[in-house]
């Protein structure tokens, strides 16, 4: 028992100083973009009823949920993602809301990932949901916002893959396979696993094997959509391709098409997606930094009303790793002025501190009887730009000013402090 006193549970992280500051800074930049796009904040409980959180998310994420039983015998769980809690909240207030709603959040989510994956079990996310609007323009707006959000974080080298749940659903229906076979084929297509597809089609009679193998290669720029049209012959997939073409027009008009690829085998882990889906990647990271899509049936499962919606979530820790991989210098907490003072000199020191803070400077105050060279060197290494010492003020009426190179200047009070 005692060995756990100093440790966090597996997959949970504690962040101090520079890393914590950087994660906050990334969130603040992205949140600023959300605000510019008129997305308003929403806050939902970290702990909810299990049955509420499992609506539409799929078996994989149900198995990864942290579950509890409260004192009244209810099964509760920590949220594994934010879309279902937001859908429940909107459904609960649907008669009071003016649609469409543009909502934003930043919150931790919890998934019991297997230890060998090396993934965190507490994941810091920031994201948006556009609820109550169904159009190519709405889909494009959310993708454009994802691009601008990632750019605001400082990322320069990233791509967004766009697909459509309806495209693969149409392909599977055309193959006339069972539901379980269809889901397996989707996973193979998504992984570009041609070996498994060939093996499966050698055991099960499927006429359109060449068509299926051709679909595996449907990834690239706009020409992919034209190639796809020649491979499919069902209305559902055709409509999906038309949706993608219209969304792409908006992305071109806004000037973010250079960030976009099409991947028509793309599927997302959550079962509630019904239309456009997308994921963002950056070089040298083996996982997505952002993902989202359209879910037009989820809110119906809560309130019985058809309310279309689309959104995305960004993994803050993954964005930070992406920035480091791109060789970017991440900011560290800055202290503009550190004021050190003895008890006897507290009054003039506190007056100076108040003045600096009114000027918008970050001020660290430390009460200490004397300042030596070791103290100065240690704090200048942490990024302190200037040290002002009142420690000798009571004896010689002098103020010691030390700049970021360690140069010392003695000042007499009366004029303005530097």
From Swiss-Prot:
It is found in: Cytoplasm. The keyword rRNA processing does not apply. Gene3D superfamilies: Bira Bifunctional Protein, Domain 2 (3.30.930.10). It comes from the Bacteria. PROSITE patterns: AA_TRNA_LIGASE_II (PS50862). One of its GO terms (cellular component) is cytoplasm. Its main location: cytoplasm. Pathway: Amino-acid biosynthesis; L-histidine biosynthesis; L-histidine from 5-phospho-alpha-D-ribose 1-diphosphate: step 1/9. Keywords: Amino-acid biosynthesis, Cytoplasm, Histidine biosynthesis. This function is generally fulfilled by the C-terminal part of HisG, which is missing in some bacteria such as this one. HAMAP family: HisZ. Heteromultimer composed of HisG and HisZ subunits. This is ATP phosphoribosyltransferase regulatory subunit. The lineage of its organism: Bacteria, Bacillati, Bacillota, Clostridia, Halanaerobiales. The gene is hisZ.
């Amino acid at each position: 028992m005692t060995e756990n006193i100093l440790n966090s549970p597996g997959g949970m992280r504690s962040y101090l100083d520079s890393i914590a500051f950087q994660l906050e800074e990334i969130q603040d930049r992205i949140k600023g973009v959300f605000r510019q796009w008129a997305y308003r904040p929403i806050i939902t409980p970290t702990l909810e009823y299990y049955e509420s959180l499992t609506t539409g998310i799929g078996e994989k994420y149900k198995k990864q949920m942290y579950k509890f039983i409260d004192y009244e015998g209810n099964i509760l769980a920590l949220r594994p993602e934010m879309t279902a809690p937001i859908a429940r909240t909107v459904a609960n207030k649907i008669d009071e809301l003016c649609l469409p709603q543009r909502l934003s959040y930043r919150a931790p989510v919890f998934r019991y990932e297997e230890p060998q994956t090396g993934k965190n079990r507490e994941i810091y996310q920031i994201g948006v949901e556009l609820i109550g609007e169904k159009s190519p323009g709405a889909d494009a707006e959310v993708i454009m916002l994802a691009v601008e959000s990632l750019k605001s974080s400082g990322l320069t080298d990233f791509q967004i893959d766009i697909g459509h749940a309806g495209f693969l659903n149409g392909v599977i229906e055309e193959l006339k396979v069972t539901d379980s076979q269809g889901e397996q084929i989707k996973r193979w297509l998504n992984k570009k696993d041609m070996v498994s597809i060939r093996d499966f089609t050698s055991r099960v009679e499927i006429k359109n094997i060449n068509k299926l193998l051709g679909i595996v290669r449907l990834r690239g720029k706009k020409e992919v959509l034209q190639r796809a049209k020649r491979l499919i012959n069902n209305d559902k997939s055709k409509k999906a391709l038309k949706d993608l073409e219209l969304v792409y027009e908006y992305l071109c008009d806004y000037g973010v098409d250079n960030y976009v690829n099409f991947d028509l085998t793309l599927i997302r882990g959550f079962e509630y997606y019904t239309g456009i889906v997308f994921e963002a990647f950056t070089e040298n990271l083996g996982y997505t930094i952002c993902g989202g899509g359209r879910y037009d049936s989820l809110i119906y499962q809560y309130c019985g009303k058809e309310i279309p919606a689309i959104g995305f979530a960004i993994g803050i820790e993954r964005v930070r790793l992406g920035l480091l991989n791109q060789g970017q210098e991440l900011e560290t907490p800055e202290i503009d002025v550190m004021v050190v003072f003895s008890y006897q000199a507290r009054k003039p020191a506190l007056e100076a501190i108040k003045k600096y803070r009114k000027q918008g400077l970050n001020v660290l105050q430390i009460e200490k009887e004397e300042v030596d060279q070791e103290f100065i060197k240690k704090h200048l290494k942490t990024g302190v730009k200037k040290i002002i010492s009142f420690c000798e003020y009571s004896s010689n009426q002098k103020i010691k000013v030390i700049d970021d190179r360690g140069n010392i200047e003695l000042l007499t009070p009366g004029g303005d402090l530097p």
